[in-house]
Amino acid sequence: MKNLYIAEKPSVARQFADVLGVKGNAGNGYLESDTAVITWCVGHLITMSYPDAYDPNLKKWSLTTIPFIPTEYKYEVLPDTKKQFNIVAGLLNRDDIGCIYVATDSGREGEYIYRLVDSMAHVTGKEKRRVWIDSQTEEEILRGIREAKPLSEYDSLSDAAYLRAQEDYLMGINFSRALSLKFSNVVQRYLGMDRCVIAVGRVMTCVLGII
């Protein structure tokens, strides 16, 4: 059986490969040796679906359909990263993979990136361990692998990541639609624009206010 290491980006995967002595052509979306397989995400491979994925009628913006608060959230593979997702999903479910080492960035967002892929790939029956490192030096990578804890110990971090993403989604979808429907005509006339969307976001709006 082989170990599978999944990094957040190709550059980090290459560093893991160098440390573990895994050679090969990265153009295939992964690297492989007799004992290990190393692959990577390219940042986010999965995104939250827009409202029209729940109901086609929600594609049209209307004050009567907000707030939009789904009881269960839908996710989909990003079109630009579908090829890499299929590669990663296939590796995660390979019969000869015994243990998955999650080596996405050590933090909430890195946790979220892997958990979404894991969920969409329907990975079951595999041992999963979390590599938590502070740098990509050889010593730190080896320590992180050696001391990797069961992925389940990071479930609370995963829950926090999902909730943060859902908060951002609800705020962006609902407030952007509400403010655009109410005030876009005024902004269009003032700026001499043909069309205007007033985008609202948890971070974006705060930064704009500071500027």
For each feature predicted by the language model, list its residue ranges:
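Prokaryote-biased recognition of long, low-complexity C-terminal linker/tail segments
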Residues: 168-211
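Intrinsically disordered, low-complexity regulatory segments
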Residues: 1-177, 206-209
